[in-house]
């Protein structure tokens, strides 16, 4: 869910994100040169769900430290209701905050390209945020139809693990790029494999899976040789989509439930899920990370990053740099007191590093590691290994819909890129 500043380059990838967030809402066919005056209003079937989200987000506006993210999200919601004037006002205020949000990269906004106000906003963002490239391709996985979502690394074994949404399996990749199956397709009746993490103590591998055709989203626990040891369906009233996860010691696993708008804690002894509480509603949570001492849990959603102290249960919004945002992070990782992530929330995909203050409650400064290059064509997650951040550059997820490949001519080997963390 994740690429540069070119409108056509971002269209397909962001269409996948919009279809994910509004997966129960029909998305109109794209129109790249339709004047705003003739743009059809295509209200979703579920108007009330969208209006309910609007009410919740508007309540947060007076106090949220992520005002730009809230405005950008509201603009997308109002676009789905066909309220064009409201969209323009929200986008103008958002862009004026200079936090990197790029309206021109949102598929739903392409109908506005002939609107002078919209064009000026896009040009302003493009002048301000130029391409940044610090990375290069580390190795390539030859299979073209994997559509990977999750990447993890075992630094001691020097092995990467990559999950396949389409093949429904997990690969292992050596640091030199040699590829083999870790959990074979068909072996355990897996659904599309999402986030992955390695237990640093025993080298076991944990995975989260999408609901798939059997509507069975679950956490999966493999031993270090690829044998499935345990599986934990989300259960309870849905919908559920367990997206990413972190392993905290031998007793608990935390996972983001994107469709359920929740973060869940799995008690490994009782095998029960409980919901983590936050001070505000959470919208489509995705990336998740633990601090180095495992006391703080960081969770990304469409409005930013929230943190929770796992000892006191106090939770808060992490305050971003005034001219930056923490909104919409797919892969989120802790590194030497900082957060590193693959970000889609600004609409133009980028790899970021956020330098946190010592208490972990606010960002002191941020650094764009990759933006607007072929290395962020359709990125999702990554892994930190030997002082560098490895991430999947071209997952192709925008070319997969309901487990069907939309255009086989666009299939290509998966490139794993790397950028140094100074």
Stretches with model-predicted labels:
Residues 127-147, 365-366:
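A short helix->beta-strand "capping" segment at the edge of beta-propeller domains
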Residues 100-125:
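TPR/TPR-like alpha-solenoid helical repeat scaffolds
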Residues 174-178, 223-227, 267-271, 309-313, ...:
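Short loop/turn segments that connect beta-strands within beta-propeller blades
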Residues 43-55:
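Helix-turn-helix repeat elements of alpha-solenoid scaffolds
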Residues 217-225, 353-355, 406-422:
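Beta-propeller blade signature
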Residues 142-157, 165, 187-211, 235-253, ...:
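Beta-rich, blade/repeat-based domains predominating
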């Amino acid at each position: 869910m994740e690429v540069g500043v070119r409108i056509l380059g971002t269209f397909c990838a962001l269409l996948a994100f919009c279809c994910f967030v509004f997966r129960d809402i029909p998305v109109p066919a794209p129109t790249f040169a339709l004047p705003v005056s003739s743009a059809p209003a295509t209200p979703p079937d579920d108007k009330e769900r969208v209006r309910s989200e609007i009410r919740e987000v508007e309540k947060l506006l007076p106090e949220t430290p992520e005002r730009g993210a809230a405005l950008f999200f509201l603009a997308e919601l109002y676009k789905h209701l066909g309220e064009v004037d409201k969209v323009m006002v929200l986008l103008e205020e958002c862009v004026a905050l200079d936090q990197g949000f790029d309206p021109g990269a949102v598929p739903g906004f392409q109908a506005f390209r002939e609107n002078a106000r919209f064009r000026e906003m896009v040009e302003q963002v493009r002048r301000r945020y130029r391409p940044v490239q610090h990375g290069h391709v580390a190795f390539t996985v030859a299979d073209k139809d994997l559509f990977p979502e999750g990447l993890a690394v075992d630094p001691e074994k020097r092995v990467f693990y990559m999950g396949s949404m389409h093949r429904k399996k997990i690969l292992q990749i050596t640091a030199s790029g040699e590829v083999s199956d870790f959990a074979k397709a068909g072996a355990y009746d897996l659904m599309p494999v999402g986030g992955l993490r390695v237990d640093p103590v025993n080298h076991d591998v944990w995975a989260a899976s999408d609901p798939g055709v059997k509507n069975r989203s679950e956490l999966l626990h493999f031993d270090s040789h690829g044998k499935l040891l345990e599986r934990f369906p989300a259960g309870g009233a849905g919908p559920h989509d367990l997206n990413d996860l972190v392993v905290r010691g031998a007793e608990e696993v935390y996972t983001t439930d994107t469709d359920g708008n929740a973060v869940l804690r799995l008690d490994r002894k009782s095998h029960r899920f409980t919901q983590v509480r936050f001070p505000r509603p959470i919208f489509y949570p995705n990336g998740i990370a633990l601090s180095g001492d495992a006391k703080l849990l960081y969770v990304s959603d469409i409005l930013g990053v929230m943190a929770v102290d796992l000892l006191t249960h106090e939770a808060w919004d992490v305050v971003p740099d005034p001219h930056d945002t923490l909104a919409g992070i797919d892969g989120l990782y802790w590194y030497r007191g900082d957060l590193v992530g693959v970000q889609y929330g600004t609409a133009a995909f980028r790899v970021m590093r956020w330098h946190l203050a010592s208490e972990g409650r606010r960002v002191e400064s941020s650094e764009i590691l990759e933006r607007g290059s072929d290395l962020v064509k359709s990125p999702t997650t990554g892994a930190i290994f030997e002082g560098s951040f490895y991430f999947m550059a071209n997952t192709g997820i925008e070319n997969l819909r309901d487990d069907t490949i939309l255009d086989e001519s666009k299939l290509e080997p998966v490139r794993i890129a790397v950028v140094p963390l100074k």
